[in-house]
């Protein structure tokens, strides 16, 4: 914060347009990943390095190869839960390493050092978890359909049908079957659904 307050006006004006372009590209990139609302954003802190990287890349971010690597970096940050602490040092490393990776150099540490444990899925129960939000977005990105309408969750359906993450097997049914809340409230028993479909279920 202090660094921003100490920023001279001339330096701000020099990078103002580039910073804005980076943020606009970041929003487009997130929409490609089916992340449409701030409430569904795994890490707000990851937007800063994402915008800086996209500003640095310019229009080259639109190339399939670059986008695939950017998605790999982004999801590793989310599922490695790397932007929850020590954000400044992680951001600085990513802003330096990711553009070099896109130009043929070594993988950034955010990609090369991450290990995701599958048993972690059982402990994701609330929106406070970045990985919980990430699973929801990935389900939509990978082609999840609404059970009632059969529609995929593009941005039109997402907003028009009031899509949110809901239980697959209803809580009451799970209780009747003797299934514990630790299981039925985890991300394993959740999927995106429209408001109406969820009400019918």
Where are these predicted regions, by residue range?
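A cross-family structural signal marking well-folded subdomains
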Residues: 1-120
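A general structural signal for short secondary-structure junctions and capping/turn motifs
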Residues: 39-41, 154-156, 182-185, 198-200
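Short, well-structured alpha-helical interface segments that form or flank functional binding sites
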Residues: 42-45, 65, 160-163, 185-189
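A broadly conserved detector of short glycine/acidic/proline-rich loop/turn motifs that flank catalytic sites
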Residues: 54, 144-145, 169, 174-175, ...
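Substrate-binding/catalytic groove segments of enzymes
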Residues: 60, 200-201
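Intrinsically disordered, low-complexity N-proximal targeting/linker segments that flank membranes
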Residues: 78-166, 173
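Short beta-strand-alpha-helix junction that forms the catalytic/metal-binding core
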Residues: 163, 175-199
